[in-house]
């Protein structure tokens, strides 16, 4: 996360369009760097296309149905390889969507699994404990416990992020070639354009 802004500044100085998938850095400074340079870029907190689509759907649901899950409780558990020290940006973003749907939940309540024993019990395959995984479960329970909703997105490896990154590069190239007035894009822009391989 600490390399986000210095890297963007280097790209801007050299005039190199770029794709960056991160939840880190100073977003306001990043926006200023891009605006000042006029550089083309795709910046997204998540490069997994389907995960971005899920987040977009929940964001829209929060706009369309505010308070739909008022009174429900929520439990969020996320697991990543032990080298990840911070809370998942994707989990934080989805919690924000659920808050819009009426759930009272703070991101500090997200349960982080970084130890192998807990990860295995959570369903992470042995082969992906240290080589890369992102498992998330959001459980919503009605006040009387009679209704439970569960949302999950589990990723083993890095392929889905690599595929999204390739799509982002191809999309960015097409926007540059077309002389697009818009210079900074997100994965949502790519999904809306149907620019998927």
Language model regions located:
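Short hydrophobic/aromatic-rich motifs at helix boundaries and adjacent loops
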Residues: 30-34, 66-68, 137-141
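Short, surface-exposed acidic/glycine-rich loop or hinge patches that mediate macromolecular interfaces
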Residues: 2, 24, 48, 81-84, ...
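Rossmann-fold dinucleotide-binding core
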Residues: 37-93, 97
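Alpha-helix C-cap/termination motif
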Residues: 13-14, 36, 67-68, 101, ...
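C-terminal substrate-binding/catalytic lobe of Rossmann-fold NAD(P)-dependent oxidoreductases
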Residues: 70-197
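Rossmann-fold NAD(P)-binding glycine/threonine-rich loop
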Residues: 3-64
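Generic low-polarity alpha-helical segments
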Residues: 1-4, 165
């Amino acid at each position: 996360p600490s390399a986000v802004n210095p890297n963007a500044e280097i790209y801007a100085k050299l005039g190199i369009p770029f794709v960056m998938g991160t939840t880190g850095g100073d977003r306001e400074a990043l926006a200023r760097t891009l605006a000042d340079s006029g550089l083309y870029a795709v910046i997204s907190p998540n490069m997994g296309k389907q995960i971005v689509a899920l987040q977009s759907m929940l964001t829209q649901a929060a706009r369309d149905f505010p308070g739909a899950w008022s009174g429900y409780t929520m439990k969020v558990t996320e697991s990543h390889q032990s080298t990840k020290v911070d809370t998942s940006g994707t989990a934080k973003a989805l919690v924000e969507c659920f808050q819009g749907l009426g759930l009272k939940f703070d991101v500090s309540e997200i349960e982080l699994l970084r130890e192998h024993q807990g990860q295995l019990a959570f369903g992470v395959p042995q082969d992906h404990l240290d080589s890369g995984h992102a498992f998330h479960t959001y459980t919503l329970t009605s006040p009387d416990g009679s209704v439970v909703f569960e949302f999950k997105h589990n990723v083993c490896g890095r392929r889905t992020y690599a595929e999204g990154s390739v799509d982002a590069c191809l999309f960015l190239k097409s926007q540059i070639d077309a002389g697009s007035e818009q210079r900074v894009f997100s994965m949502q822009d790519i999904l809306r354009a149907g620019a998927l391989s």
